[in-house]
């Protein structure tokens, strides 16, 4: 069981308490933490759409600390980030691995950053399927299509060639914040505000 801190605000109408994440959402900050999965993706997408409706001209900030997870859940978040009008700033706090790194790179160009001791990891998508040989073949073809799509989007966001992305994602590829900047996954390493 996790405890979520509460924040108390004084207003002209008295005190009002919020959980910390709701309070930060008022400041256009979204936390993408933990495994990327369908329920979390739906919450992130809803927050992105809500903030766009509130003010389509104002940046949205996504703080990422994720080991990665589901490709389809991650693509729901990614597609929404690309679809909405506001610029989406991404910031890696802790780690952005696998789909977390993909979402980090998918922020608005020039507005993607990592904290100095953050770790970023890219690799090819993982798959596992059991069943009849024909079904295994279908799933293998699907994961190869997904791999191609992810590589194309990473190449677009980083400026690396598809061939370089394919080589660098063949195995787990861990990077420091500075290495992620040199690679093009982020634009800046933030030391202080």
UniProtKB/Swiss-Prot annotation:
Keyword set, alphabetical order: Cytoplasm, Hydrolase, Protease, Serine protease
Q: Where is the active site?
A: 98, 123
Xref: Gene3D superfamilies: 2-enoyl-CoA Hydratase, Chain A, domain 1 (3.90.226.10)
| Protein's cellular compartments | Cytoplasm
Instruction: Assign the protein's first listed, main location to one coarse class.
Output: cytoplasm
The uppermost taxa in this organism's lineage are: Bacteria, Pseudomonadati, Pseudomonadota, Gammaproteobacteria, Pasteurellales
Spell out the GO cellular component terms annotated for this protein, sorted alphabetically and separated by semicolons: cytoplasm; endopeptidase Clp complex
Query: Native species of this protein?
Result: Histophilus somni (strain 2336)
- As recorded in UniProt, its EC number(s) are 3.4.21.92
Function of the protein = Cleaves peptides in various proteins in a process that requires ATP hydrolysis. Has a chymotrypsin-like activity. Plays a major role in the degradation of misfolded proteins.
What protein name applies here?
A: ATP-dependent Clp protease proteolytic subunit
Task: Name any Gene Ontology BP term.
Answer: protein quality control for misfolded or incompletely synthesized proteins
